[in-house]
Regions:
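C-terminal regulatory or interaction extensions
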Residues: 157-246
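Generic serine detector
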Residues: 14, 19, 37, 68, ...
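Extended mid-to-C-terminal alpha-helical interaction segments
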Residues: 205-320
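N-terminal, charged low-complexity regulatory/assembly segments
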Residues: 1-189, 194-197
Length: 320
């Protein structure tokens, strides 16, 4: 497993940040894989995968660059500059474009775990990578960025509340597969066998993205990032027809999402419903004993009760 040595001061000073480039790169990974992990990703791929594949078919060098950079166990570092927070996409993409060609080639050899194909022995790899990321941003992420950002901001609110309630260990253990707090100032960041890194004294940031993706990145020894999938997704699992008929589509959607604790802000972002509508649904579900609420720091989190779980499961199984 790969792990970082993190002292108490570094962990206490860590923060959550949003990154349009990280969101875009997560989208690139999803387009490259072409396999959805939930209905929202399936609909998104149906809209955008044909255009993405057509673009790469017309640019075989960039297509090879993507295949080489997204390694089975490692991503070429120059593709994922460590987020700094509060940077627009254009500034982050400029950092990809500014990578030194020799560094880009070296990073690709690491992600390939072998020699570089002859077609990639060239100096325009950073520009090609930045151009592709700009395409993914413009065509697939930017039009939906405001909604995505609301989901990401809601995730940060919930995670911050969890830190206040249960400490960093509880947050890190649930962040993403392969990440957990090992104790003795050790943070496991993935399941791969890489040498440990001492990061005490560096800046540590945690970066949510809406696709089911995650990775780590760093800049020298000054800044480290853990990118993880946000709890909100682009679209929830559709409610069973019977549940929608019983509760109404909007209320059923809220109940489905509350399989895990969520704040009102997260529900608004994930459902696209207004704050007033979500609030009314929650009041009815609370009165009916289908959901419960508890305070986590400054936030109030809602989740299904056992009765709510029974109702959802019964509706999903259908008659009989």
């Amino acid at each position: 497993m790969g792990w970082w040595q993190v002292n108490a001061d570094t962990l206490a000073g860590s923060r959550f940040v949003l990154s349009p480039l990280a969101e875009t790169f997560a989208g690139l990974k999803l387009l490259h894989a072409g396999v959805p992990s939930h209905p929202g990703e399936r609909a998104w791929l149906r809209r955008h995968l044909p255009g993405y594949r057509a673009r790469l078919a017309a640019d075989p060098v960039t297509a090879l660059l993507v295949r080489s950079g997204l390694g089975r166990e490692w991503i070429a570092d120059f593709l994922t500059p460590t987020p700094r927070g509060d940077e627009p996409f254009e500034a982050e993409a400029a950092r990809v474009r500014a990578a030194r060609p020799e560094d880009a080639r070296a990073h690709l050899r690491v992600s390939l775990a072998g020699p570089l194909p002859d077609a990639l022995e060239r100096d325009d790899l950073p520009a090609r990578a930045a151009g592709l990321l700009e395409y993914v941003w413009t065509e697939t992420v930017s039009p939906d960025w405001e909604r995505r950002r609301r989901i990401l901001e809601a995730d940060v609110v919930a995670r911050t509340a969890q830190v206040s309630r249960g400490g960093w260990a509880a947050v890190l253990d649930a962040l993403r597969p392969g990440t957990r707090w090992l104790g003795e100032n050790r943070l496991q960041v993935n399941a791969h066998e890489y040498p440990p890194r001492e990061i005490s004294g560096a800046e540590l940031v945690f970066v949510p993205v809406t696709p089911r993706a995650g990775w780590v990145s760093w800049e020298e020894r000054e800044r480290y990032a853990v990118v993880y999938p946000a709890t909100g997704v682009l679209a929830p699992e559709p409610a069973p027809a019977g549940l929608g008929a019983l509760l109404g589509a909007g209320r059923a959607r809220v109940l489905i999402l509350l399989a895990s604790p969520m704040s009102t802000t997260q529900l608004v972002a994930s459902t696209g419903q207004g704050l007033g509508s979500v609030g009314r649904h929650l009041r009815v579900l609370l009165d009916a004993g289908m959901v419960e609420r508890r305070r986590a720091g400054r936030s109030v989190l809602y989740s299904r009760t056992a009765a709510g779980d029974v109702l959802v499961k019964a509706a999903a199984s259908g008659p009989g």
